[in-house]
């Protein structure tokens, strides 16, 4: 079954890593939500917290699973926390994927802040062969949530 998935991540630090994951998803004919152009994101931030919350809420509509892409600063992101809370409130499947070892545009990797979201499956993109297995991970998260 095709799923529409919301990808949650710390924008500034992990956008290039998130794009690797997202592109692997959409090249397999899947739908992704939760991506925004850097200029659009800066404009959204200038509009304030309510505008950001409304944008996140709109992006979450019609999704069945939220995938939290975890890098070095993800655990301290208030917006990632908000996305996890909203996903739990609406009964979406949740899982975490460590993206810290995916190289950024400069060829650098980073550390991982921890395993979030707590209480859900957590995978390592490189070691657990994310490109080949993410579809199965997402299906499991959806089924675990009764979706």
Language-model regions, residue ranges each:
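Conserved N-terminal substructure of TIR/SEFIR domains
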Residues: 1-62, 142-147
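Anion (oxyanion) recognition and catalysis
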Residues: 88
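Generic recognition of short, well-ordered alpha-helical segments
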Residues: 16-20, 78-82, 108
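Conserved beta-strand-loop-alpha-helix hinge of the TIR/SEFIR fold
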Residues: 59-85, 96-103
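C-terminal interaction surface of TIR/SEFIR-family domains
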Residues: 4-6, 20, 48, 103-147
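Residues at the C-termini of beta-strands that transition into short coil/loop
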Residues: 34-39, 98-100, 126
């Amino acid at each position: 079954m095709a799923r529409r998935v919301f990808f949650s991540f710390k924008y500034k630090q992990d956008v290039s890593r998130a794009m690797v994951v997202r592109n692997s998803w959409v090249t397999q004919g899947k739908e992704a939500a939760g991506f925004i152009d850097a200029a659009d994101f800066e404009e959204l931030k200038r509009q304030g917290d309510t505008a950001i919350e409304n944008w996140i809420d709109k992006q979450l509509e019609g999704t069945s699973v939220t995938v939290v892409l975890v890098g070095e600063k993800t655990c301290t992101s208030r917006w990632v926390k908000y996305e996890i809370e909203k996903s739990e409130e609406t009964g979406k499947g949740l899982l975490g994927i460590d993206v810290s070892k995916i190289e950024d545009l400069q060829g650098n990797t980073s550390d991982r802040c921890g395993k979030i979201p707590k209480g859900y499956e957590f995978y390592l993109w490189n070691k657990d062969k994310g490109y080949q297995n993410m579809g199965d991970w997402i299906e499991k998260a959806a089924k675990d949530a009764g979706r």
